[in-house]
Amino acid sequence: MFFKKKQKHYEPFDLERPLLSFAKNDAWTIRDACEGTQIFGATGSGKTSGSGQAIAKSFLNGGFGGLILTAKKDERATWEKYCYEAGCLDALFIISPKSGYKFNFLDYELNRAGDGAGHTENLVSLFFTILEIAEQKSGGSSDPYWERATKQLLRNTIDLLSIAQGRISMMDMYKVITTAPLDYEDVQDTEWAKHSFCYQLIKQAKQKNLSHSKKMDLDFTIRFWLNEFPNLSDRTRSIIVSSFTSMADCFLRGVLRDMFCTETNIFPEFTHEGGIILIDLPIKEYGQLGLFAQVLFKYIWQQAAERREVYKNPRPVFLWVDESQNFITSYDQQFQTTARSSRACTVYLTQNLPNYTAALAGGSEARAKVDAFLGNLQTKIFHANGDHRTNTWASDLIAKTWQYRSNLSSSMSNDGKVFFPETTGKQSGVSHSEALNYQVLPHEFTQLRKGGYKNNLLVD
């Protein structure tokens, strides 16, 4: 008598619930998704339309919420199609200049739920994430001194505004920094004091009834603006000031001002309830503006995902980043170390390893950062690729095994009998050896199918 094996029932967001099946007994589960995914493949290899599409649709069909960053103009249409086919088009929120969705990131960070809301260091980290990506793209210095000095500038700007007026805006930060004293003559000049927004805030803050802790913060802030800042060399001051103002300038005009510095009617937390947020500011169209906006929203979304109480709402959320070399920051590695416990499913797609190294300004330090980040993405998918470093790295990941080899040898000899070749002798033998070799050789990745009609639309 034969009994049919009872199919296991899974709760919708059970970590062991299969999302995809690669073979009869090889399921890719929600748990696997939460451990992060990296997809490599050359242009035209099928990484987006092949494994990328399969994973994306499994997330949508599974009821996941998510954030999608865009590098190319056609990505919005692609995801609209995916959502329509999955029956969740109504859950798709598109942030674009014409959509009407706005996100005042400073107001959000000051007023969001949680004990960390409004803390100066959190706001400094938020700004520094944008500054980091700007420095990466410009090939700027990564000298720790400039990082510390810029953070000090931001910290004292935020504290002064927070204590004096109880609110912070990008424009007010800009005004504080650009009206600060440049030397001790300014500090003693009554005419400068009369017209300096920075000095007027200092006067206003002194009149506040503050706690002992806030008084100490204000004292340090005043010392910075009236003693330390004007004592900086012109070169040092100009570098740290321009680090902020060159970035802030983008948020003080046009698209970024209207979308990210006015009001808030969309929140990262929408994704925790199954919403899908797509930022339609592709960098191929909007350039640096699109990059700054998306990196900013990604950072805030990552932190919101880490703060949520998964035991109350176990719905997985995903972060989808195609052409991911454009959007990678140092915080990604830190986020990925705890993403599984937050049920955050990161999917990054790029052509090759050198893309990441170049994005992080190259060098051994950049390689170490890339290795640390990729080490925390447990699922790695390799499509057709012509990059030697990526293919060799893939072969190393798959590892080597001990393989047996047999060698057949033969030889012929006539022992010097020139006149009687028919007496020639023949010898043969077989030898065996064991060697440690790649299971998949690097060159095999160059031969994978890329789809198209000549491959019957199949992608390896």
Residue ranges and their predicted role:
Residues D74-R76, S99-Y101, L353-T357, R389-T390:
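Short gly/pro/ser/thr-enriched loop/turn and capping motifs at secondary-structure boundaries
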Residues P282, Q351-L353, N385:
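Histidine- and/or cysteine-centered catalytic micro-motif in compact active-site loops
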Residues A71, L349-N352:
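Conserved H-loop
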Residues F2-D14, P18-K24, W28-A344, E444-L458:
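P-loop NTPase motor domains
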Residues S141, Y145-A149, D159, E269, ...:
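P-loop NTPase motor core of the ASCE superfamily
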